[in-house]
Amino acid sequence: MSEPLLSVRNLETYYGPITAIRGVSFDVTEGQIVTILGANGAGKTTVLKSVCGAMEAQKGTISFAGRSVTGREPDWVARQGIAHVPEGREIFPFMTVKGNLMMGAYSRHDRGGIERDLDIVYGYFPVLRERQSSQAGYLSGGQQQMLAIGRALMARPKLMLLDEPSLGLSPILVKEIFGIIRRLNQEQKVTMLLVEQNANMALKTAHYGYVLEVGRIVLEGACEKLVENEDVREFYLGVKETAVRGKKRWKRTKRWR
């Protein structure tokens, strides 16, 4: 078996005295979309911030493409080929749309390649071409999410970290965004680590998944298997098994507890 593109082992990260994630281990295979599911506060964002260097992990190791990135600065990690699309998008509101996209290519020096990639981004997100001279702060929420993904794509990443791309978007826009995520994976060969509360959409999009609860991984498997798991169906997909006359007679707890 080939070495995973990203390998995280026994990761622990703290917020002061509070343990945010504890003993987290997982792999991301090159070419795949891997998702981490979990409720709000489970530690999903902390995992991504630890991987990209935005937060320092107190314990554990992070390896990317066979090289340790544990404890390195975010700009160094980004230059290795990891691009982060943060929760809440975090675009530069007073810069133009094109200016935001060019910020994604700040570490690149191949002008011709940058222009080609800009055309690729505009191909996936035509509205960004139409609004390229507008201030990014005037874009809608969905357009800002497209801009955040496009900005990450401009870095020509090997691995893209996506933090809650469905946050605050309408169901129609969520479907559009996740369709583009699948296309980027298939057509541009971008490996992705996706954290998402919308378990239904995440499991439809990803190849492999992990369930994170209270800072620890409690379940993993291929997504087509996870959607059949009784706990995942009830507690993350909202599908309940019913008893006689369509009513459940007891409140079941999760089997992994």
Model region roles, listed by residue range:
Residues 2-257:
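Glycine-rich phosphate-binding loops of nucleotide-dependent enzymes
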